[in-house]
Curated annotation (Swiss-Prot):
There is a cross-link at residue 249 (Glycyl lysine isopeptide (Lys-Gly) (interchain with G-Cter in SUMO2)). The lineage of its organism: Eukaryota, Metazoa, Chordata, Craniata, Vertebrata. This is U3 small nucleolar RNA-associated protein 15 homolog. Pfam families: UTP15_C, WD40. The gene is UTP15. Part of the small subunit (SSU) processome, composed of more than 70 proteins and the RNA chaperone small nucleolar RNA (snoRNA) U3. May be a component of the proposed t-UTP subcomplex of the ribosomal small subunit (SSU) processome containing at least UTP4, WDR43, HEATR1, UTP15, WDR75. Interacts directly with UTP4 and WDR43. GO terms for biological process: positive regulation of transcription by RNA polymerase I; ribosomal small subunit biogenesis; rRNA processing. Keywords: Acetylation, Isopeptide bond, Nucleus, Repeat, rRNA processing, Ubl conjugation, WD repeat. It comes from Pongo abelii. One of its GO terms (cellular component) is fibrillar center.
Amino acid sequence: MAGYKPVAIQTYPILGEKITQDTLYWNNYKTPVQIKEFGAVSKVDFSPQPPYNYAVTASSRIHIYGRYSQESIKTFSRFKDTAYCATFRQDGRLIVAGSEDGGVQLFDISGRAPLRQFEGHTKAVHTVDFTADKYHVVSGADDYTVKLWDIPNSKEVLTFKEHSDYVRCGCASKLNPDLFITGSYDHTVKMFDARTSESVLSVEHGQPVESVLLFPSGGLLVSAGGRYVKVCDMLKGGQLLVSLKNHHKTVTCLCLSSSGQRLLSGSLDRKVKVYSTTSYKVVHSFDYAASILSLALAHEDETIVVGMTNGILSVKHRKSEAKKESLPRRRRPAYRTFIKGKNYMKQRDDILINRPAKKHLELYDRDLKHFRISKALDRVLDPTCTIKTPEITVSIIKELNRRGVLANALAGRDEKEISHVLNFLIRNLSQPRFAPVLINAAEIIIDIYLPVIGQSPVVDKKFLLLQGLVEKEIDYQRELLETLGMMDMLFATMRRKEGTSVLENTSDGFPENKKIES
């Protein structure tokens, strides 16, 4: 007697997102560590120098965290009101921050009391940065002004009053100590030169500007405001290169990867988008639990830190390369185990019998082997199977139909069991890969349970859903056939015109309108 042959489960190609190098790179982070702050995290900034600590601005405090620590190693709390935009100097030794009362404070990273206090703004200071020479600080405030401060003398050097609304973001050039950028709620981004008394360039963004970023080379400017991220060429007078609209809500922060090849943007829609700086297409996306206010990347992209409106600081560390642990050496079998039976000499009358390989059957195969057809169908109609592996359910239905026992397996079911069958049909009947098998199953179910329709509201509702699905599919197929008919007519007309033009233009190899002299 031949052995039982398991049901062949038809496999289908898995359609999903293409796995790229960016996907592998940006997914190579550990589970995020979440730190609760006292208020919304308005700014995160990494020190440019080892050990790459980062400053977190939240409420009226500035916390300094170690690269891998979950506890703050230093706190600056000498603020009367909310603190903003704590930023490291290029050497990582000083940190500057603005505040709600209009003051700008300079701190030594090794101390606690402010080294300098710059007073001059009349409203909240939301952006501060060090210039490239390390001896000046630029600040922008809600009083519409931009000021340049001298650190050694604690004095104001210049004041620019060209913005007509709140100045909420800015950055200084990393190459030129006299150039810096500011963005305002008046929809403009301006470039100022400390050697002049007015701006040297103004770019219209079209929305209140929330964040600006200058590429290390100084040639490209990125501005974020509203749902737009715009990239401008500063060497061509601020010419717009590309406008990106990949977020659903206001973009609040921008960041560059360590290599400068990827641009990151965070938004109130709780997403961080990663763009290629060559094609400006989204190559990856991160999802977070709350709206995002700030974003920063560590050296070599080893850590990504995101600050949110609910006061949560999300910290992701890159996975380290797995090291092979030196496990104790397994004891090998004895030598006699390998030579057992090797010295046996074959005889002419010996009969060689191969030990049959034991086949492990699935539970539904065991039921089919013992002709428990209803039980086999029940197993594959379990919600876990129908949702994760619907192809198994379809294969079993196809096998039962081949055996001619599908009607017997579907008959005699109660309200709950028939609901499972109808749910599966409703979910998968419109899929082209399953339709040939499931249409036949649907016809059998209708024939069996037609006499009892109207006795169960639950089953009646499922049948109505199935009817609506079939009608919608029929309308869809009719529209497709109409479209195919129109396309065939167009193609036929084009072929007829091409054939006619060839006949008109050629007659025995010569143009028709040309007379041939005899």
